């Protein structure tokens, strides 16, 4: 096929000349139509042309002169320039739109002329603006357009601008297909334009997949090479002679014929439909439609399809049909010859295929068919089992299928077959399982409480796919469950219940069941729960619980197992008692609940228990220690070899357990001194089952006491202290064993201290302290300490000078108790000499000791201390003077001067008095010129002996030192004696000397001078020394006798005075009893000293007539001391410090406080009182007033007081007798003194308090003990003498250890009555012990000289004498020390311990 040449697309220039609104908006393959064409021009040259202005909304039109018409002349104007940019905005069939530009400034006044030239034809158009539409043109014709700008004069035109172009041809007419083939089409058309002879034609062929162009120079064209059955668009364009300017296209669309269909077949033959398919070789087959002619014996109809297949529906099932297919393009008019196919439709599927019967190896099937052609049908039954397929046939609508496998899935498909014997309808299928065979050997492999395990067998070949339904039936329920295997665990059953189990084999469809196999049984009862055993010795009580709903029908079997022995018991209720068992033996009790059948038992619930062992026997302690106890016991049980033993150790709420494998145990880790209850339980071999406990209660031994010390040792007591760290020590008592040689005594204490009394002084004791637990029986190990008591001081100590010897003779009575010797200490100032005495006789015998030589006439303090094993007694002191002896011989001779013819003066210094005071001097005259050596024998010679020539040496004058007048001494202390005066002194005459004789003088000095009855000096019995003889003095001649006589008289007077003075001096020395010098001038003026052995008769005498004698004595004492001054007490500032106006302290003995800020601050109502051995042994004071408490404590501190004796209650008979001056609990400050009560022991008759007293300024402190006697009424006396004597002993024992300068402070209310009685008792007891004499009167007198009203009442005075009487009587009864007989009071007090601040005083424990 020849293809015409294609025309070029629309020229680009043409497009640019067109206005924007009329440009082709697509490629020039479609219509290039022009818009705004106002008129389509004809081809006649006579048509009127018009010019339309396309800008400014103005339309200009004018008649145009015929071509060649001349223009009239105008005024000459400037020629416009040629227009620029002349172009076509639009080219149409009969019109053209032109545009141009003008750059002239006068262009606004321009008009424009457009010259239109076509060959020889010229037309003119005008325009006021720069564009113009030229209409009335001839289609497809060449035109030249020249535009001239014309000035405002309308005549002057510029150069013309030209453009040449063809108008578009007119579209072709009557375009049609003369022939349409499978791959080609013949087109024809017509054209009416006058210029058509010069036209060529472009045919544009467009399909969905391509665009082609071809050309033709005539008005027809054959288009070849097309695709069959394809829709094509054919568009024909007339093209002007320039081969560029095209007319608008004329179009026609059509299909090429399809290719014939091929390979027609039925893809699917259905019951009422057939699916046909075919092929077509044309490439445009997707655009085909197909007509299918459907023909059967009675009818014809057509179906169409847009694709190469179709489903023909609405057919009659099982009927013969002829199907013919025609391919038809989209226009449904072009067809080729059809292709035919003959076939039967399928019969309809059979309906309601059901099984009338399903058996183990056969199935009966039935079905229905509704087709009108069904009478000609036969039926094929396909029997499928897995991959095995068998076919059965039937001419009717039912069939029995036999020879099947049990329990197997079969699919039975029934096909209706048409009359051709081949075309079968869709199969109607039914799938089912044949029944499985019934299960075999159904049995219960396991019967549980809530479950049963069933097993069975199945011999079917399909049994692997079986499941099994187990129907479980009881009286109250029916349940089903399934199993995939030939066994099943049936759970959730009710214990102890009868169940029927039916097992059905179920085919794999889970529906088809075999006939059931049946078994019946009881589930096991639930094991009993909460099985408990009450242990007995030979029986066990069991009880249990069963929660099963069927438990009312249960019985119970109890299996009793002991080793290899098994017994069974039964019970109808959930409890039982098993008897006849062995003690302490392991039994396993297994309880089985038995269902109502009497055979089905639940699992046994077991409990293994031991019977209780019998209680242990003979529990006892083999040993009780501090932290351990050894227990033993016996057990008679036959199984006791396997027993262990639990020992429960109970201590209050604390319980611990110990174990033992044998019948004894050591329990350790106990607390000392603690009550424990030990309960021993025999425990069976299980380690848990215990028999009844056997108990024993006991205390562990307390620990041995620690730090046992003798804190305070006296003659008859030892204060023991110790510590106990035991937790239970608060409940302990303590036994103190006091051992001396073979004698052992005991005492008890409730605290960790004890004062052991009634000891023998100076004796070694072994003190063993045993802590005793609260049972008062269990003792700890004793802690021992050996301690010697302080030995007793010697009694009746006397110190005597030995005449004319320098040593002293000491005498004392051997003390009570033991001792190893005596230390004798002799000291004078800083000089001290110590000696020892080792021996003493029996108690009370006198010991005499001679000291080593001392200085003559020296006052020594001699102290005798009893020594015993390093301890010493309180020293007994005496102040003694050694004897006087001859005075030392003077170094110088006397100075002798002649006074007259018969007298001379002898001047000599005093002899040294170191060997005794000089008592007298004897002036001796020696008449021999040579050999002046006076001797004691010369003292016997007198002046008369000299005159009688019996001696050359004589005593001329004796001077009594005490009688020397002041005139007898010169101012330089020398003595001057005038010899020869003729006076007489004692038995010596101071006779005149012989004138003109020579004399020498010597002076004899006497420390002791004794005279004969004749007043002659006893030389051998006197202590005398002689001075060297003086130089010889010669007397002058005698001036007269008268002078000698005068001197003799004077000497005689002097002798008398000397003798009188000497006698007075001797008497005074004899009367003086106490060598101590009082601190005051008070001297005892009266006393009634009575020996102890005479006191009883004296007492009875004074006691007669209602104590008349004592009353007289007491009356005599009333005036004692009352005239002594009390100025300080009477000062106005001090009156408020006195409790009573009639009890004021004497100035001479009052206690003065130190550091007074004013003169009255030193005052306190208190006096120093003499004791037996010290003038300041006591301070007697009134009870403090509120305003004097600070002064009271200030006195205690300043006077170094360690002991206070309080003899009154604070309030008596509703009257305040004394302020409470001590704190109860907290420390309290009294001025600068801080007082803290350390301890308080309250006893029936007295209270003992210890205070710590501290000076806030110096921070020094010491302890003060207060002895508060509470059983002495004011102005009265205690009930018994023993009570006061014992109390005095208590105070004395303590205070004897105080510092030696520490007085005892005694007070009651006024500080006179009870206070005086107590001080007097102390002095009298010591006087009895030391002197074996009694002076009650003298003691009271002495006290009253120091403080008024001491021993205030007659009753108190009589009471003092009664005390003395009782003391003496007790001595006679061999109770040597009454003070040791306080069996009641001291037993109470013996555990009281001094406060912690007590240390040592003077080497003794305090």
From Swiss-Prot:
User: What InterPro entries does its record include?
Assistant: FN3_dom, FN3_sf, Ig-like_fold, Prot-tyrosine_phosphatase-like, PTP_cat, PTPRJ_TM, RTP_Phos/Ushers, Tyr_Pase_AS
What family does the entry list? Belongs to the protein-tyrosine phosphatase family. Receptor class 3 subfamily.
**Where, per UniProt, does this protein localize?**
Cell membrane; Cell projection, Ruffle membrane; Cell junction
The record's region (Disordered) falls at 39-72
Q: Which organism is it from?
A: Gallus gallus (Chicken)
Which residues lie toward the Cytoplasmic compartment?
Answer: 1066-1406
Q: Where is the composition biased (Polar residues)?
A: 41-58
By which gene is this protein encoded? Answer: PTPRJ
| Glycosylation-annotated residues | 36, 52, 97, 103, 118, 124, 186, 192, 243, 275, 281, 296, 302, 331-332, 364, 385, 391, 453, 459, 484, 500, 510, 547, 568, 630, 636, 651, 657, 719, 745, 750, 766, 776, 804, 828, 1010
| Residue ranges that the UniProt entry lists as topological domain Extracellular | 25-1044
Q: What is this protein called?
A: Receptor-type tyrosine-protein phosphatase eta
Membrane topology label: Single-pass type I membrane protein
- PROSITE patterns linked: FN3 (PS50853), TYR_PHOSPHATASE_1 (PS00383), TYR_PHOSPHATASE_2 (PS50056), TYR_PHOSPHATASE_PTP (PS50055)
Q: Give a GO biological-process term.
A: positive regulation of cell adhesion
Keyword terms of this UniProt record: Cell junction, Cell membrane, Cell projection, Glycoprotein, Hydrolase, Membrane, Protein phosphatase, Repeat, Signal, Transmembrane, Transmembrane helix
User: Which cysteine pairs are joined by S-S bonds?
Assistant: none
Q: Which residues form the active site?
A: 1308 (phosphocysteine intermediate)
């Amino acid at each position: 096929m020849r293809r015409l040449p294609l025309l070029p697309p629309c020229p680009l220039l043409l497009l640019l000349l067109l206005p924007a609104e009329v440009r082709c908006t697509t490629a020039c393959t479609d219509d290039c139509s022009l818009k705004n064409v106002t008129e389509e021009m004809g081809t006649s040259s006579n048509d009127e042309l018009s010019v339309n202005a396309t800008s400014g909304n103005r339309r200009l039109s004018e008649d145009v002169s015929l071509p060649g018409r001349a223009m009239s002349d105008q005024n000459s104007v400037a020629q416009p320039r040629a227009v620029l940019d002349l172009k076509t905005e639009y080219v149409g069939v009969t019109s053209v739109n032109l545009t141009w530009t003008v750059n002239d400034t006068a262009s606004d006044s321009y008009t424009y002329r457009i010259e239109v030239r076509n060959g020889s034809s010229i037309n003119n158009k005008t325009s006021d603006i720069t564009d113009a539409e030229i209409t009335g043109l001839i289609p497809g014709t060449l035109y030249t357009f020249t535009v001239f700008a014309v000035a405002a004069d309308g005549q002057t035109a510029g150069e013309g601008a030209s453009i040449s172009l063809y108008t578009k041809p007119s579209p072709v007419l009557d375009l049609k297909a003369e022939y349409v083939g499978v791959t080609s089409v013949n087109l024809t058309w017509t054209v009416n334009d006058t210029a058509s002879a010069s036209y060529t034609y472009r045919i544009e062929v467009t399909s969905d997949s391509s665009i082609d162009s071809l050309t033709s120079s005539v008005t027809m064209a054959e288009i070849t090479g097309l695709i069959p059955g394809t829709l094509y668009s054919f568009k024909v364009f007339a093209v002007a002679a320039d081969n560029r300017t095209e007319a608008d296209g004329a179009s026609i669309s059509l299909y090429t014929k399809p290719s014939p269909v091929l390979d027609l077949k039925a893809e699917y033959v259905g019951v009422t439909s057939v699916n046909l398919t075919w092929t077509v070789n044309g490439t445009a087959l997707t655009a085909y439609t197909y007509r299918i002619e459907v023909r059967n014996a009675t009818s014809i109809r057509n179906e169409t399809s847009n694709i190469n297949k179709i489903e023909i529906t609405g057919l009659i099932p099982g009927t013969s049909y002829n199907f013919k297919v025609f391919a038809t393009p989209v226009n449904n008019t072009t067809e080729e010859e059809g292709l035919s196919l003959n076939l039967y439709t399928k019969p309809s599927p059979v309906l309601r295929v059901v099984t009338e019967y399903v058996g183990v190896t056969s199935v009966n099937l039935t079905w229905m068919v509704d087709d009108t052609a069904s009478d000609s049908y036969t039926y094929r039954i396909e029997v499928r089992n897995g991959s095995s397929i068998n076919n059965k046939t039937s001419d009717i609508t039912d069939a029995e299928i036999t020879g099947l496998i049990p329990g197997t899935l079969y699919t039975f498909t029934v096909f209706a077959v048409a009359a051709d014997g081949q075309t079968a309808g869709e199969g109607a299928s039914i799938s089912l399982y044949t029944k499985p065979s019934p299960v075999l050997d159904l049995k219960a492999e396991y019967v549980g409480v809530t479950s049963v395990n069933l097993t069975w067998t199945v011999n079917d070949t399909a049994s692997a796919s079986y499941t099994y339904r187990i129907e479980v039936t009881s009286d109250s329920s029916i349940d089903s469950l399934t199993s995939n295997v030939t066994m099943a665990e049936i759970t959730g059953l009710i214990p102890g219940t009868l169940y029927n189990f039916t097992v059905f084999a179920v085919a794999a469809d889970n529906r088809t069941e075999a006939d059931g196999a049946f078994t019946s049984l009881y589930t096991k009862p639930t094991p009993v729960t909460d099985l408990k055993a009450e242990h007995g010795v030979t029986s066990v009580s069991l009880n249990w619980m069963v929660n099963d709903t069927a438990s009312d029908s249960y019985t119970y079997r109890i299996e009793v197992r002991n080793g290899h022995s098994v017994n069974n018991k039964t019970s109808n209720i959930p409890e039982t008692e098993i008897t006849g068992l062995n003690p302490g033996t392991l039994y396993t009790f297994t309880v089985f609940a038995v269902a109502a059948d009497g055979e089905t038992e639940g699992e046994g619930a077991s409990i293994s228990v031991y019977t209780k062992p019998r209680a242990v026997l003979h529990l006892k302690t083999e040993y009780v220690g501090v932290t351990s106890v050894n227990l033993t016991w016996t057990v008679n049980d036959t199984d006791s070899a396997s027993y262990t033993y639990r020992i429960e150790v109970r201590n209050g709420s604390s319980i611990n357990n110990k174990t033992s494998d044998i019948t004894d145990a050591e329990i350790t880790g106990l607390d000392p001194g603690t009550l424990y209850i030990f309960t021993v339980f025999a425990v069976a071999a299980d380690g848990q089952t215990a028999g009844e406990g056997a108990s024993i209660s006991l205390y562990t031994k307390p620990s041995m006491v620690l730090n046992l010390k003798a804190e305070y040792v006296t003659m008859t007591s030892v204060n023991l202290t110790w510590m106990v760290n035991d937790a239970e020590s608060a409940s302990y008592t303590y036994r103190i064993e006091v051992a001396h040689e073979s004698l052992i005594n005991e005492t008890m204490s409730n605290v960790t201290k004890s004062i052991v009394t009634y000891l023998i002084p100076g004796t070694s004791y072994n003190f063993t302290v045993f802590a005793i637990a609260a049972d008062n029986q269990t003792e700890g190990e004793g802690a021992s300490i050996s301690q010697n008591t302080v030995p007793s001081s010697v009694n009746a100590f006397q110190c005597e000078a030995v005449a004319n010897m320098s040593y002293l003779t000491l005498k004392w009575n051997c003390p009570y108790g033991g001792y190893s010797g005596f230390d004798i200490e002799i000291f004078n100032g800083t000089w001290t000499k110590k000696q020892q005495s080792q021996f003493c006789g029996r108690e009370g015998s006198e010991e005499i000791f001679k000291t080593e030589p001392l200085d003559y006439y020296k006052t020594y303090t001699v102290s005798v201390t009893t020594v015993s094993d390093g301890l010493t007694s309180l020293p007994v002191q005496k102040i003694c003077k050694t004897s006087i002896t001859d005075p030392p011989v003077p170094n110088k001779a006397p100075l002798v001067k002649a006074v007259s013819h018969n007298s001379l003066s002898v001047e000599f210094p005093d002899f040294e008095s170191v060997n005794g005071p000089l008592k007298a001097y004897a002036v001796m005259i020696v008449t021999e010129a040579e050999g002046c050596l006076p001797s004691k024998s010369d003292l016997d010679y007198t002046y008369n002996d000299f005159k009688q020539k019996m001696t050359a040496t004589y005593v001329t004058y004796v001077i009594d030192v005490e009688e020397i007048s002041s005139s007898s001494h010169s101012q330089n202390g020398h003595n001057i004696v005038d010899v020869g005066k003729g006076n007489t002194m004692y038995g010596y005459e101071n006779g005149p000397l012989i004138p003109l004789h020579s004399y020498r003088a010597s002076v004899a000095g006497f420390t002791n001078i004794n005279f004969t009855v004749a007043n002659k000096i006893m030389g051998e019995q006197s202590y005398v020394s002689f001075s060297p003889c003086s130089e010889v003095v010669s007397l002058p001649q005698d001036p007269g006798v008268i002078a000698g006589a005068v001197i003799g008289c004077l000497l005689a007077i002097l002798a008398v005075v000397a003798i009188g003075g000497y006698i007075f001096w001797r008497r005074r020395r004899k009367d003086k009893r106490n060598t101590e010098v009082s601190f005051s001038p008070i001297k005892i003026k009266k006393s009634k000293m009575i020996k102890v052995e005479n006191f009883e008769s004296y007492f009875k005498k004074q006691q007669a007539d209602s104590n008349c004698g004592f009353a007289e004595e007491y009356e005599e004492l009333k005036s004692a001391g009352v005239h002594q001054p009390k100025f300080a007490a009477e000062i106005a500032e001090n009156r408020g410090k006195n409790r009573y106006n009639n009890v004021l302290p004497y100035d001479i003995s009052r206690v003065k406080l130190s550091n007074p800020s004013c003169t009255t601050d030193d005052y306190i109502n208190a006096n120093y009182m003499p004791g037996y051995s010290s003038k300041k042994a006591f301070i007697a004071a009134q009870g403090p007033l509120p305003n004097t408490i600070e002064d009271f404590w200030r006195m205690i501190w300043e006077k170094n007081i360690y002991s206070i004796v309080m003899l009154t209650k604070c309030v008596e008979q509703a009257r305040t007798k004394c302020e409470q001056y001590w704190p109860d609990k907290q420390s309290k400050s009294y001025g600068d003194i801080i007082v803290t009560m350390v301890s308080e022991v309250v006893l029936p008759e007295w209270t003992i308090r210890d205070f710590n007293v501290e000076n806030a300024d110096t921070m020094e402190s010491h302890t003060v003990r207060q002895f508060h006697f509470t059983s002495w009424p004011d102005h009265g006396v205690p009930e018994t003498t023993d009570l006061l004597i014992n109390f005095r002993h208590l105070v004395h024992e303590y205070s004897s250890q105080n510092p030696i300068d520490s007085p005892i402070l005694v007070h009651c209310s006024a500080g006179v009555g009870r206070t005086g009685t107590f001080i007097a008792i102390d002095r009298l007891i010591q006087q009895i012990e030391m002197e074996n004499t009694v002076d009650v009167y003298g003691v009271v007198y002495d006290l009253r000289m120091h403080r008024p009203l001491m021993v205030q009442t007659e009753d108190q005075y009589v009471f003092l004498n009664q005390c003395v009487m009782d003391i003496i009587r007790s001595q006679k009864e061999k109770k040597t020390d009454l003070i040791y007989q306080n069996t009641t009071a001291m037993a109470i007090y013996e555990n009281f311990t001094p406060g912690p601040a007590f240390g040592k005083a003077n080497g003794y424990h305090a």
